Protein backbone atom coordinates (compact mmCIF):
# COMPACT_ATOMS: atom_id res chain seq x y z
CA UNK A 1 0.00 0.00 0.00
CA UNK A 2 1.38 3.43 -0.95
CA UNK A 3 1.92 6.17 1.63
CA UNK A 4 -0.73 8.35 -0.03
CA UNK A 5 -3.40 5.62 0.03
CA UNK A 6 -2.54 4.85 3.66
CA UNK A 7 -2.91 8.53 4.59
CA UNK A 8 -6.19 8.70 2.69
CA UNK A 9 -7.49 5.65 4.54
CA UNK A 10 -6.54 7.16 7.90
CA UNK A 11 -8.31 10.38 6.97
CA UNK A 12 -11.43 8.46 5.98
CA UNK A 13 -11.39 6.69 9.35
CA UNK A 14 -11.09 10.01 11.19
CA UNK A 15 -13.94 11.46 9.15
CA UNK A 16 -16.14 8.44 9.88
CA UNK A 17 -15.41 8.70 13.61
CA UNK A 18 -16.16 12.43 13.55
CA UNK A 19 -19.48 11.85 11.79
CA UNK A 20 -20.34 9.17 14.36
CA UNK A 21 -19.84 11.70 17.17
CA UNK A 22 -22.03 14.26 15.37
CA UNK A 23 -24.71 11.63 14.77
CA UNK A 24 -24.69 10.79 18.48
CA UNK A 25 -25.36 14.49 19.23
CA UNK A 26 -28.36 14.37 16.86
CA UNK A 27 -29.82 11.77 19.29
CA UNK A 28 -32.13 9.62 17.15
CA UNK A 29 -30.57 6.67 15.34
CA UNK A 30 -32.57 7.37 12.17
CA UNK A 31 -30.85 10.76 11.86
CA UNK A 32 -27.37 9.26 11.55
CA UNK A 33 -27.57 8.38 7.86
CA UNK A 34 -28.88 11.74 6.57
CA UNK A 35 -26.45 13.64 8.81
CA UNK A 36 -23.48 11.71 7.45
CA UNK A 37 -24.74 12.11 3.89
CA UNK A 38 -25.34 15.84 4.29
CA UNK A 39 -21.89 16.56 5.77
CA UNK A 40 -20.23 14.42 3.09
CA UNK A 41 -22.15 16.24 0.37
CA UNK A 42 -21.09 19.63 1.72
CA UNK A 43 -17.43 18.63 1.42
CA UNK A 44 -17.73 17.20 -2.09
CA UNK A 45 -16.82 19.43 -5.04
CA UNK A 46 -19.77 21.20 -6.62
CA UNK A 47 -21.12 24.68 -7.24
CA UNK A 48 -24.42 24.42 -5.36
CA UNK A 49 -24.80 22.93 -1.89
CA UNK A 50 -28.57 23.19 -1.56
CA UNK A 51 -30.51 19.98 -0.90
CA UNK A 52 -31.30 18.86 -4.45
CA UNK A 53 -27.75 19.14 -5.86
CA UNK A 54 -26.46 17.37 -2.73
CA UNK A 55 -28.95 14.55 -3.27
CA UNK A 56 -27.93 14.24 -6.93
CA UNK A 57 -24.24 13.92 -6.03
CA UNK A 58 -24.79 11.51 -3.17
CA UNK A 59 -27.37 9.21 -4.80
CA UNK A 60 -27.45 9.90 -8.55
CA UNK A 61 -29.56 6.79 -9.22
CA UNK A 62 -32.06 7.50 -6.42
CA UNK A 63 -32.23 11.28 -6.15
CA UNK A 64 -35.86 11.46 -5.00
CA UNK A 65 -35.34 9.21 -1.97
CA UNK A 66 -32.14 10.99 -0.96
CA UNK A 67 -33.78 14.39 -1.42
CA UNK A 68 -36.66 13.41 0.88
CA UNK A 69 -34.27 12.10 3.51
CA UNK A 70 -32.02 15.17 3.52
CA UNK A 71 -34.93 17.61 3.39
CA UNK A 72 -36.68 16.03 6.37
CA UNK A 73 -33.46 15.92 8.38
CA UNK A 74 -32.60 19.58 7.76
CA UNK A 75 -35.98 21.28 7.51
CA UNK A 76 -38.08 19.30 10.01
CA UNK A 77 -36.11 17.08 12.41
CA UNK A 78 -35.95 18.68 15.91
CA UNK A 79 -32.30 18.05 16.77
CA UNK A 80 -30.26 20.60 18.73
CA UNK A 81 -27.97 22.97 16.83
CA UNK A 82 -26.21 23.87 20.09
CA UNK A 83 -25.45 20.21 20.89
CA UNK A 84 -24.02 19.58 17.43
CA UNK A 85 -21.86 22.72 17.50
CA UNK A 86 -20.62 21.79 20.97
CA UNK A 87 -19.66 18.31 19.73
CA UNK A 88 -17.80 19.82 16.78
CA UNK A 89 -16.01 22.22 19.12
CA UNK A 90 -14.88 19.42 21.44
CA UNK A 91 -13.30 17.63 18.47
CA UNK A 92 -11.86 20.58 16.54
CA UNK A 93 -10.57 22.90 19.28
CA UNK A 94 -7.89 20.52 20.67
CA UNK A 95 -6.61 20.05 17.11
CA UNK A 96 -6.47 23.80 16.54
CA UNK A 97 -4.55 24.27 19.80
CA UNK A 98 -1.78 21.94 18.60
CA UNK A 99 -0.30 24.99 16.86
CA UNK A 100 -0.90 27.47 19.66
CA UNK A 101 -3.51 28.65 22.18
CA UNK A 102 -6.79 30.41 21.52
CA UNK A 103 -5.89 34.10 21.30
CA UNK A 104 -9.30 35.65 20.63
CA UNK A 105 -13.05 35.22 20.69
CA UNK A 106 -14.38 36.93 17.57
CA UNK A 107 -17.90 38.34 17.21
CA UNK A 108 -19.19 39.08 13.73
CA UNK A 109 -22.22 38.83 11.48
CA UNK A 110 -22.73 37.94 7.85
CA UNK A 111 -25.51 38.65 5.39
CA UNK A 112 -27.25 36.51 2.79
CA UNK A 113 -28.97 38.35 -0.09
CA UNK A 114 -32.44 36.89 -0.57
CA UNK A 115 -35.36 37.83 -2.81
CA UNK A 116 -38.93 38.01 -1.59
CA UNK A 117 -40.35 38.57 1.89
CA UNK A 118 -41.34 35.06 3.00
CA UNK A 119 -37.98 33.54 3.99
CA UNK A 120 -37.36 33.87 7.72
CA UNK A 121 -35.64 37.09 8.78
CA UNK A 122 -35.49 38.69 5.34
CA UNK A 123 -35.85 42.50 5.28
CA UNK A 124 -34.10 45.35 3.55
CA UNK A 125 -31.03 46.03 5.72
CA UNK A 126 -27.28 46.46 5.43
CA UNK A 127 -25.68 43.40 3.83
CA UNK A 128 -21.92 43.10 4.26
CA UNK A 129 -21.66 40.64 1.38
CA UNK A 130 -22.67 43.34 -1.13
CA UNK A 131 -21.61 46.36 0.95
CA UNK A 132 -24.95 48.20 0.86
CA UNK A 133 -28.63 48.09 1.86
CA UNK A 134 -30.15 44.98 0.32
CA UNK A 135 -32.97 42.50 0.80
CA UNK A 136 -31.21 39.92 2.97
CA UNK A 137 -31.06 38.06 6.24
CA UNK A 138 -28.20 38.38 8.72
CA UNK A 139 -26.76 35.89 11.21
CA UNK A 140 -24.58 36.62 14.25
CA UNK A 141 -21.70 34.30 15.13
CA UNK A 142 -19.06 33.77 17.80
CA UNK A 143 -15.76 32.14 16.79
CA UNK A 144 -12.75 30.93 18.75
CA UNK A 145 -9.45 31.78 17.06
CA UNK A 146 -5.82 30.73 17.36
CA UNK A 147 -3.10 32.48 15.36
CA UNK A 148 -3.69 30.14 12.40
CA UNK A 149 -7.35 29.09 12.48
CA UNK A 150 -10.79 29.91 13.82
CA UNK A 151 -14.02 28.00 14.34
CA UNK A 152 -17.57 29.37 14.71
CA UNK A 153 -19.02 27.94 17.93
CA UNK A 154 -22.34 29.81 18.06
CA UNK A 155 -24.71 30.95 15.32
CA UNK A 156 -28.10 32.68 15.35
CA UNK A 157 -30.28 34.53 12.90
CA UNK A 158 -30.92 38.19 13.68
CA UNK A 159 -34.71 38.62 13.66
CA UNK A 160 -35.83 42.21 12.89
CA UNK A 161 -38.68 43.66 14.96
CA UNK A 162 -41.08 43.56 12.02
CA UNK A 163 -40.65 39.77 11.97
CA UNK A 164 -40.88 39.41 15.74
CA UNK A 165 -44.29 41.11 15.78
CA UNK A 166 -45.73 39.30 12.73
CA UNK A 167 -47.61 36.31 14.16
CA UNK A 168 -48.58 34.90 10.77
CA UNK A 169 -45.05 34.88 9.36
CA UNK A 170 -43.70 33.51 12.65
CA UNK A 171 -46.11 30.60 12.33
CA UNK A 172 -45.35 29.98 8.66
CA UNK A 173 -41.58 29.89 9.21
CA UNK A 174 -41.62 28.05 12.54
CA UNK A 175 -39.97 30.71 14.69
CA UNK A 176 -39.88 29.37 18.28
CA UNK A 177 -42.18 31.08 20.78
CA UNK A 178 -39.29 32.02 23.05
CA UNK A 179 -37.55 34.08 20.36
CA UNK A 180 -38.09 37.79 21.05
CA UNK A 181 -36.42 40.84 19.58
CA UNK A 182 -32.72 41.24 20.36
CA UNK A 183 -30.16 43.53 18.80
CA UNK A 184 -27.09 41.97 17.22
CA UNK A 185 -24.86 42.98 20.17
CA UNK A 186 -27.43 41.47 22.56
CA UNK A 187 -27.43 38.20 20.57
CA UNK A 188 -23.63 38.14 20.64
CA UNK A 189 -23.60 38.71 24.41
CA UNK A 190 -26.03 35.80 24.87
CA UNK A 191 -23.71 33.58 22.83
CA UNK A 192 -20.67 34.69 24.83
CA UNK A 193 -22.40 34.09 28.17
CA UNK A 194 -23.26 30.55 27.14
CA UNK A 195 -19.69 29.73 26.12
CA UNK A 196 -18.39 31.26 29.38
CA UNK A 197 -20.82 29.02 31.31
CA UNK A 198 -19.37 26.01 29.50
CA UNK A 199 -15.97 26.92 31.01
CA UNK A 200 -14.17 27.28 27.70
CA UNK A 201 -10.75 28.93 28.11
CA UNK A 202 -11.33 32.65 27.65
CA UNK A 203 -9.50 35.15 25.44
CA UNK A 204 -9.99 38.82 24.51
CA UNK A 205 -13.17 39.50 22.54
CA UNK A 206 -12.78 41.14 19.12
CA UNK A 207 -15.60 42.91 17.28
CA UNK A 208 -16.14 45.80 14.89
CA UNK A 209 -17.81 49.12 15.64
CA UNK A 210 -21.30 47.75 15.00
CA UNK A 211 -20.84 45.99 18.36
CA UNK A 212 -18.33 48.28 20.07
CA UNK A 213 -20.62 51.31 19.73
CA UNK A 214 -23.06 49.57 22.06
CA UNK A 215 -21.99 50.52 25.60
CA UNK A 216 -24.13 47.74 27.10
CA UNK A 217 -22.19 45.22 25.02
CA UNK A 218 -18.84 46.53 26.29
CA UNK A 219 -20.08 46.67 29.88
CA UNK A 220 -21.51 43.15 29.56
CA UNK A 221 -18.11 41.81 28.52
CA UNK A 222 -16.44 43.50 31.49
CA UNK A 223 -19.07 42.10 33.87
CA UNK A 224 -18.22 38.62 32.56
CA UNK A 225 -14.55 39.26 33.31
CA UNK A 226 -13.59 39.31 29.63
CA UNK A 227 -11.08 41.65 28.06
CA UNK A 228 -11.86 43.17 24.67
CA UNK A 229 -10.39 44.97 21.68
CA UNK A 230 -13.38 46.33 19.79
CA UNK A 231 -14.00 48.98 17.17
CA UNK A 232 -15.85 52.21 17.98
CA UNK A 233 -16.93 55.17 15.88
CA UNK A 234 -15.04 58.47 15.79
CA UNK A 235 -17.85 60.37 17.55
CA UNK A 236 -17.37 58.33 20.76
CA UNK A 237 -16.34 60.69 23.57
CA UNK A 238 -13.56 60.10 26.10
CA UNK A 239 -11.48 61.81 28.76
CA UNK A 240 -7.79 61.65 27.96
CA UNK A 241 -5.24 60.66 30.63
CA UNK A 242 -5.10 63.24 33.42
CA UNK A 243 -8.64 64.45 32.71
CA UNK A 244 -11.91 63.30 34.24
CA UNK A 245 -15.44 64.47 34.99
CA UNK A 246 -15.84 66.95 37.83
CA UNK A 247 -16.58 65.48 41.26
CA UNK A 248 -20.06 65.66 42.74
CA UNK A 249 -21.19 69.04 44.09
CA UNK A 250 -20.31 69.84 47.67
CA UNK A 251 -23.07 68.89 50.10
CA UNK A 252 -24.71 71.91 51.76
CA UNK A 253 -26.15 70.00 54.69
CA UNK A 254 -29.68 69.60 53.36
CA UNK A 255 -31.24 66.65 51.55
CA UNK A 256 -29.26 63.77 50.20
CA UNK A 257 -25.55 64.38 49.58
CA UNK A 258 -24.84 64.85 45.83
CA UNK A 259 -23.05 61.83 44.41
CA UNK A 260 -23.09 62.13 40.60
CA UNK A 261 -20.09 63.20 38.53
CA UNK A 262 -20.44 66.46 36.59
CA UNK A 263 -19.44 68.41 33.50
CA UNK A 264 -19.72 72.08 32.61
CA UNK A 265 -19.22 74.17 29.48
CA UNK A 266 -15.50 74.54 30.14
CA UNK A 267 -15.00 70.92 31.16
CA UNK A 268 -16.12 68.51 28.42
CA UNK A 269 -14.79 65.24 26.98
CA UNK A 270 -13.37 65.01 23.46
CA UNK A 271 -14.58 62.95 20.53
CA UNK A 272 -12.08 60.35 19.34
CA UNK A 273 -11.54 62.30 16.13
CA UNK A 274 -10.84 65.52 18.08
CA UNK A 275 -8.42 63.71 20.34
CA UNK A 276 -6.61 62.02 17.45
CA UNK A 277 -6.13 65.28 15.57
CA UNK A 278 -4.78 67.01 18.68
CA UNK A 279 -1.89 64.56 19.03
CA UNK A 280 1.59 65.64 17.90
CA UNK A 281 3.13 63.92 14.82
CA UNK A 282 5.64 62.09 17.00
CA UNK A 283 2.74 60.11 18.53
CA UNK A 284 2.22 58.06 15.37
CA UNK A 285 4.32 54.90 14.93
CA UNK A 286 4.58 52.53 11.94
CA UNK A 287 3.48 48.98 12.83
CA UNK A 288 3.24 45.85 10.66
CA UNK A 289 0.95 43.05 11.83
CA UNK A 290 1.04 40.17 9.33
CA UNK A 291 2.07 39.09 5.85
CA UNK A 292 -0.33 40.09 3.10
CA UNK A 293 -0.59 38.44 -0.31
CA UNK A 294 2.27 40.55 -1.68
CA UNK A 295 3.96 42.21 1.29
CA UNK A 296 3.66 42.88 5.01
CA UNK A 297 0.58 44.82 6.04
CA UNK A 298 1.67 48.09 7.63
CA UNK A 299 0.12 51.35 8.83
CA UNK A 300 0.53 54.14 11.42
CA UNK A 301 -0.90 53.78 14.92
CA UNK A 302 -0.93 55.33 18.32
CA UNK A 303 -2.34 54.15 21.64
CA UNK A 304 -3.15 56.11 24.79
CA UNK A 305 -5.04 55.62 28.02
CA UNK A 306 -8.53 57.13 28.25
CA UNK A 307 -11.78 56.94 30.19
CA UNK A 308 -14.97 56.51 28.17
CA UNK A 309 -17.32 59.44 28.83
CA UNK A 310 -20.62 57.80 27.86
CA UNK A 311 -23.24 59.05 30.34
CA UNK A 312 -20.64 59.45 33.08
CA UNK A 313 -22.87 62.20 34.56
CA UNK A 314 -25.10 59.35 35.75
CA UNK A 315 -22.22 57.70 37.56
CA UNK A 316 -20.86 58.26 41.05
CA UNK A 317 -17.47 56.66 40.36
CA UNK A 318 -14.94 57.31 37.63
CA UNK A 319 -15.04 54.84 34.72
CA UNK A 320 -12.02 52.55 34.47
CA UNK A 321 -9.12 53.59 32.26
CA UNK A 322 -8.66 51.60 29.06
CA UNK A 323 -6.68 51.76 25.84
CA UNK A 324 -7.67 53.81 22.84
CA UNK A 325 -5.97 52.48 19.69
CA UNK A 326 -6.08 54.67 16.58
CA UNK A 327 -5.03 53.92 13.00
CA UNK A 328 -4.07 56.79 10.68
CA UNK A 329 -2.59 55.62 7.36
CA UNK A 330 -0.09 58.08 5.90
CA UNK A 331 -2.09 58.45 2.68
CA UNK A 332 -5.31 59.44 4.52
CA UNK A 333 -6.34 62.94 5.58
CA UNK A 334 -7.65 61.74 8.95
CA UNK A 335 -7.66 58.61 11.14
CA UNK A 336 -9.61 55.69 9.71
CA UNK A 337 -10.20 53.30 12.63
CA UNK A 338 -10.55 53.45 16.40
CA UNK A 339 -10.62 50.67 18.99
CA UNK A 340 -11.19 50.53 22.75
CA UNK A 341 -9.25 47.83 24.59
CA UNK A 342 -9.25 46.64 28.18
CA UNK A 343 -5.90 44.85 27.96
CA UNK A 344 -3.41 45.52 30.76
CA UNK A 345 -1.83 48.97 31.01
CA UNK A 346 1.62 47.60 30.12
CA UNK A 347 0.48 46.13 26.76
CA UNK A 348 2.78 47.20 23.92
CA UNK A 349 1.49 48.99 20.82
CA UNK A 350 2.46 46.12 18.51
CA UNK A 351 0.49 43.61 20.59
CA UNK A 352 -2.58 45.87 20.56
CA UNK A 353 -2.40 46.26 16.78
CA UNK A 354 -1.91 42.55 16.08
CA UNK A 355 -4.87 41.58 18.23
CA UNK A 356 -7.16 44.28 16.82
CA UNK A 357 -6.27 43.20 13.28
CA UNK A 358 -6.73 39.49 14.01
CA UNK A 359 -10.45 39.87 13.34
CA UNK A 360 -9.61 39.40 9.62
CA UNK A 361 -9.46 35.64 10.17
CA UNK A 362 -13.26 35.44 10.48
CA UNK A 363 -13.55 36.90 6.98
CA UNK A 364 -11.56 33.93 5.70
CA UNK A 365 -13.98 31.60 7.51
CA UNK A 366 -17.02 33.20 5.94
CA UNK A 367 -15.42 33.21 2.51
CA UNK A 368 -14.65 29.50 2.67
CA UNK A 369 -17.95 28.58 4.32
CA UNK A 370 -19.87 30.39 1.59
CA UNK A 371 -17.77 29.53 -1.45
CA UNK A 372 -16.73 25.96 -0.63
CA UNK A 373 -19.40 24.62 1.74
CA UNK A 374 -22.49 26.49 0.55
CA UNK A 375 -23.33 28.32 3.78
CA UNK A 376 -25.67 30.64 1.88
CA UNK A 377 -27.17 28.02 -0.44
CA UNK A 378 -30.07 26.86 1.74
CA UNK A 379 -33.28 27.48 -0.20
CA UNK A 380 -35.88 26.79 2.48
CA UNK A 381 -37.84 29.50 4.28
CA UNK A 382 -38.00 28.16 7.82
CA UNK A 383 -36.13 29.01 11.02
CA UNK A 384 -35.15 25.42 11.78
CA UNK A 385 -33.82 24.64 8.31
CA UNK A 386 -31.79 27.85 8.14
CA UNK A 387 -30.04 27.05 11.42
CA UNK A 388 -29.66 23.31 10.75
CA UNK A 389 -27.99 23.94 7.37
CA UNK A 390 -25.58 26.47 8.90
CA UNK A 391 -24.75 24.12 11.78
CA UNK A 392 -23.91 21.28 9.39
CA UNK A 393 -21.79 23.61 7.23
CA UNK A 394 -19.85 24.69 10.32
CA UNK A 395 -19.46 21.09 11.50
CA UNK A 396 -18.12 20.01 8.10
CA UNK A 397 -15.82 23.04 8.02
CA UNK A 398 -14.60 22.07 11.48
CA UNK A 399 -13.30 18.75 10.17
CA UNK A 400 -11.35 20.61 7.47
CA UNK A 401 -9.79 22.82 10.14
CA UNK A 402 -8.88 19.80 12.25
CA UNK A 403 -7.20 18.10 9.30
CA UNK A 404 -5.22 21.22 8.44
CA UNK A 405 -4.05 21.44 12.04
CA UNK A 406 -2.22 18.14 11.58
CA UNK A 407 0.22 19.93 9.29
CA UNK A 408 2.59 22.81 9.99
CA UNK A 409 0.82 26.14 10.65
CA UNK A 410 1.60 27.41 7.15
CA UNK A 411 0.51 24.22 5.34
CA UNK A 412 -2.84 23.61 3.69
CA UNK A 413 -4.32 20.12 3.71
CA UNK A 414 -6.16 20.57 0.45
CA UNK A 415 -9.50 18.93 -0.26
CA UNK A 416 -10.55 15.75 1.48
CA UNK A 417 -10.23 12.56 -0.50
CA UNK A 418 -13.97 11.93 -0.73
CA UNK A 419 -15.70 10.08 -3.52
CA UNK A 420 -19.28 10.27 -4.79
CA UNK A 421 -21.07 8.26 -7.46
CA UNK A 422 -21.00 9.73 -10.94
CA UNK A 423 -24.13 11.72 -11.83
CA UNK A 424 -26.01 10.13 -14.74
CA UNK A 425 -25.94 12.24 -17.92
CA UNK A 426 -29.75 12.17 -18.11
CA UNK A 427 -30.18 13.83 -14.68
CA UNK A 428 -31.70 17.33 -14.77
CA UNK A 429 -32.37 19.44 -11.64
CA UNK A 430 -35.95 20.52 -11.05
CA UNK A 431 -36.77 23.65 -13.01
CA UNK A 432 -34.32 22.89 -15.81
CA UNK A 433 -35.98 23.49 -19.22
CA UNK A 434 -36.58 20.28 -21.16
CA UNK A 435 -34.49 19.69 -24.26
CA UNK A 436 -36.45 20.12 -27.48
Regions found by a protein language model. Name each.
Residues 107, 111, 211, 258-269, ...:
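Short amphipathic alpha-helical "interface-anchor" segments enriched in bulky aromatics
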Residues 325-341, 358-373:
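A glycine-rich, aromatic-flanked flexible loop/lid motif
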Residues 111-112, 330-331, 344-346:
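Short, glycine-/Ser/Thr-/acidic-enriched flexible segments
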Residues 101-102, 139, 321-322, 335-338:
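Short, surface-exposed beta-edge/turn micro-motifs
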Residues 2-206, 210-230, 234-237, 244, ...:
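Conserved, well-structured functional cores that handle cations and Mg-NTP chemistry
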Residues 138, 361, 365, 388-394:
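Catalytic-loop motifs flanking and including active-site residues across diverse enzymes
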Residues 1-31, 42, 159, 173-180, ...:
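A short, flexible helix-boundary coil/loop motif
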Amino acid sequence: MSASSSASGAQQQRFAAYLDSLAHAAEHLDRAAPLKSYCTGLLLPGERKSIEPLAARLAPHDVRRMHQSLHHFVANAPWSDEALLETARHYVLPMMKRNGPVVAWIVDDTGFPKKGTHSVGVVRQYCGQVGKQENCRVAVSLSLATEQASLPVAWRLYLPEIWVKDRERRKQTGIPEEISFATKPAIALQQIRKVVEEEVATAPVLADAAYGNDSEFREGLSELGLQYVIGVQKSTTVWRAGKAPLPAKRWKGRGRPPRLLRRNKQHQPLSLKQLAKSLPPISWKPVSWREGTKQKLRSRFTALRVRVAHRDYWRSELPTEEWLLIEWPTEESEPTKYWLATLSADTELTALVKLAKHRWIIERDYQELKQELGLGHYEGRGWRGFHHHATLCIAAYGFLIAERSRFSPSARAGQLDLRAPEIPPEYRPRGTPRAR
